[in-house]
A protein has these predicted regions:
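Active-site-adjacent "lid/gating" segments in soluble enzymes
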Residues: 1-109, 116
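Beta-strand segments within the central parallel beta-sheet cores of soluble alpha/beta enzyme folds
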Residues: 52-60, 164, 247-251
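Beta-rich nucleic-acid/ligand-interaction surfaces
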Residues: 63, 141, 180-184
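Aromatic-enriched alpha-helical interface/lid elements that frame and gate functional surfaces
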Residues: 92-168, 172, 253
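A glycine-rich dinucleotide-binding beta-alpha-beta segment and adjacent secondary-structure elements
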Residues: 167-220, 273
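Flexible, small-/acidic-enriched active-site or ligand-binding loops
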Residues: 200-249, 269
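Amphipathic terminal alpha-helices
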Residues: 245-273
Length: 273
């Protein structure tokens, strides 16, 4: 779907022609969340008017909706967007930079932030330079400005720059790998990893539900993912009102699947090892 809806044409290093897929299943997640919004809207309509709704939603719809500034800009000016790597198409500087030792991201969104960046880095080089005086000019002269900044940033370590950015109130972040993220204090403070006991695997770490901090919370951090067919029998009995013999018949002939104690869950490995 990322290929069909143009996402892969704008993702990846700008100097390469190879299409790149976004590394997580974001479209599946967004479609689910959009579906929930549709359901909630339908429930509100039902409560107000007594009328139900048929919700028609597709991955394609959500992919186009999610193209936001890229898609809308094309609709306005008709120009096919190109790959920009980590760069932002309408804001400069807004991208990844390589420090002396490792990478960081810089997001200079406002003119005030750019003024602070100039004062931090090199007023003699950047100040009073009409090519960079406004964001529009910086977008036009992107390559020149990025070249100057990249040269400056390469002379000191990432921690040096991040500390200075913080002092000058300039948005920035280290570019972490997944291990770095799970080692961060905020990950632990926000309880972003749950530990549950799975009936066939044993102790199992899970990504937490982001709604866990809603008060009072309706999400649980103690229930493991269900086994294949774990609730089939319960649903057929309580919601479809099927008798036990019919459920057993459907299970035995393969029409449905009811989980058994010996069900095994395969664990994948997406590491580089």
């Amino acid at each position: 779907m990322q290929a069909l809806t143009g996402i892969m044409s704008i993702t990846g290093p700008k100097e390469e022609e190879t299409p790149v897929r976004v590394g997580v299943a974001w479209l599946d997640v967004l479609t689910g969340l959009t579906g929930v919004s549709g359901i909630l809207s339908a429930l509100i309509r039902l409560g107000r008017s007594g009328e139900g709704q048929f919700i028609d939603l597709s991955l394609f719809d959500v992919a186009l909706m999610s193209s936001i500034n890229i898609g809308e800009t094309f609709l306005v000016n008709g120009k096919v967007p190109k790959r920009l790597g980590s760069e932002h198409p309408q804001i400069v500087p807004y991208q990844a930079f390589k420090a002396k030792d490792s990478w960081f991201a810089l997001a200079v969104v406002t003119e005030k932030q750019y003024e602070r960046l100039v004062n931090l880095l090199s007023p003699s080089v950047l100040n009073n330079n009409s090519r960079f005086s406004t964001n529009s000019n910086r977008v036009t002269n992107r390559e020149d400005l990025i070249g100057i900044l990249a040269n400056i940033f390469s002379k000191n370590t990432r921690s040096y720059w991040l500390n200075n950015f913080a002092d000058f109130n300039i948005p920035s972040s280290p570019i972490n790998n997944i291990n770095d993220v799970f080692e961060m204090e905020i990950t632990k403070e926000r309880n972003n990893v749950w530990k549950v006991n799975h009936p066939t695997i044993g102790p199992l770490p899970l990504l937490a539900n982001a709604l866990q901090h809603t008060n009072p919370s309706s999400v649980s951090n103690t229930t493991p993912p269900p086994l294949l067919g774990q609730h089939t029998h319960e649903i057929l009995r309580e919601f479809a009102n099927l008798p036990e013999k019919e459920i057993e018949f459907l299970d035995n002939n393969g029409s449905v699947f009811c989980s058994r104690k010996d069900t095994k869950i395969p664990l994948g490995d997406n590491s580089d090892d």
